[in-house]
Design a protein with these regions (language model features):
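Conserved PRPP/pyrophosphate-binding segment of the phosphoribosyltransferase/PRPP-pathway fold
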Residues: 1-121, 128-157
Length: 157
């Protein structure tokens, strides 16, 4: 797992404005910071999927918009539709840490042919790693040769 920055003030406020305030222009600097900090040893980039309901609410997938920038800056192929979130789950941030793994169990499906490919999953923030761990499990079952997590920020915990 590679994180560009620590999730702390003022970055936490910027990510919140981006994610919940519709400040899409922030995808460029957030994605650029991530692109500059990662080892470019993967074949494809897969954004963390967002459930349909949350996508309709928000109007965009924050991980996909960041992944577009990272893919462009690193010249690594982007597979935007490789995986889907098939379960409408409560937001991870609203749950106690111990419940987060259970919350995302069987939440993802990956239909893309990833056989033998090294995959980077791009997301905005990593806290417990439960969501990334579950998607990693699904990607490996789909044939990925390896999976790395690339996040803009991680919590100190």
């Amino acid at each position: 797992m590679e994180a560009a920055l620590l999730y702390d003030y003022p970055l936490d406020a910027l990510i919140h404005a981006y994610k919940y305030g519709g400040k899409l222009a922030l995808a460029r600097p957030l994605g650029a910071a991530l692109a500059q900090s990662v080892a470019r040893d993967v074949d494809v980039i897969v954004p963390m999927p967002l459930a349909r309901g949350r996508l309709a609410e928000r109007g965009f997938n924050q991980a996909l918009e960041i992944a577009r920038v990272v893919a462009s800056d690193t010249r690594i192929a982007l597979f935007p539709d490789a995986c889907r979130k098939v379960a409408e789950t409560p937001p991870q941030a609203a749950l106690p840490w111990k419940e987060r793994s259970r919350n995302v169990r069987r939440a993802f499906v990956c239909d893309a042919d990833l056989a033998g490919r090294k995959v980077a999953v791009v997301d905005d923030v990593l806290t417990t790693g439960a969501t990334l761990n579950e998607l990693t499990r699904v990607l490996l079952r789909a044939g990925a040769a390896g999976v790395r997590g690339w996040v803009v920020a991680r919590t100190a915990r």
